[in-house]
Swiss-Prot record:
Its main location: cytoplasm. The gene is gmk. Its EC number is 2.7.4.8. ATP binds at A11, P12, S13, G14, A15, G16, K17, S18. Transmembrane segments: none annotated. This is Guanylate kinase. It comes from Salmonella typhimurium (strain LT2 / SGSC1412 / ATCC 700720).
Length: 207
């Protein structure tokens, strides 16, 4: 069976990364593509399901996993830990399923060091003006918060060149088509096609 591909997807807040991933998943069968489910120490929010949205664990369990190097990457955010389990990812990839990991540039660097075969995609907004408009979309944040989020977005975007692919999300449908094209091209790589069609190739080359 052909090994699945791990896709690292990063973008500044407001670039439409999560919406693009969710739209892509709706067009792909579950046995072909899945989104990574992270471990976290934060409490479940209403409607969240263990194993579907996150794997919810306590701080001691999480630290034990860190100690045995169970995570491809992990980070602390506002007092809670978040991490990507190496075992979980590898088990899914071994079934031939592609896995999408929605993560920032720092997490992406950690994962590339441990899984250099992963493919990485960065998504940019079409302009700062449009990014500002999207960041203001909720209409609930102060100017100070907007300015902070914009500064964080610029810092995130400065790492775009570290990725394999670049998508500019000006038109959503076009960006989604670009994302699908990347996935299709990766599935046609020689390494995956040789695994997938091994029996056919053997028969074709037999005397």
């Amino acid at each position: 069976m052909a090994q699945g591909t791990l896709y690292i997807v990063s973008a500044p807040s407001g670039a439409g990364k999560s919406s693009l991933i969710q739209a892509l998943l709706k067009t792909q069968p579950l046995y072909d593509t899945q989104v990574s489910v992270s471990h976290t120490t934060r409490a479940p929010r209403p409607g969240e399901v263990h194993g579907e949205h996150y794997f919810f664990v306590n701080h001691d369990e999480f630290k034990t996993m860190i100690g045995r190097e169970a995570f491809l990457e992990h980070a602390e955010v506002f007092g809670n830990y978040y991490g990507t389990s190496r075992e979980t990812i590898e088990q899914v990839l071994a079934t031939g399923v592609d896995v999408f990991l929605d993560i920032d540039w720092q997490g992406a660097q950690q994962i590339r060091e441990k899984m250099p075969q992963a493919r990485s995609i960065f998504i940019l907004p079409p302009s700062k003006i449009e990014l500002d408009r999207r960041l203001r979309g909720r209409g609930q944040d102060s100017e100070e918060v907007i300015a902070k989020r914009m500064a964080q977005a610029v810092a995130e975007m400065s790492h775009y060149a570290e990725y394999d692919y670049l998508i500019v999300n000006d038109d959503f449908d076009t960006a989604l088509s670009d994302l699908k094209t990347i996935i299709r091209a990766e599935r046609l790589r020689m390494s995956r096609q040789k695994q997938r069609h091994n029996a056919l190739i053997s028969k074709l080359l037999a005397d």
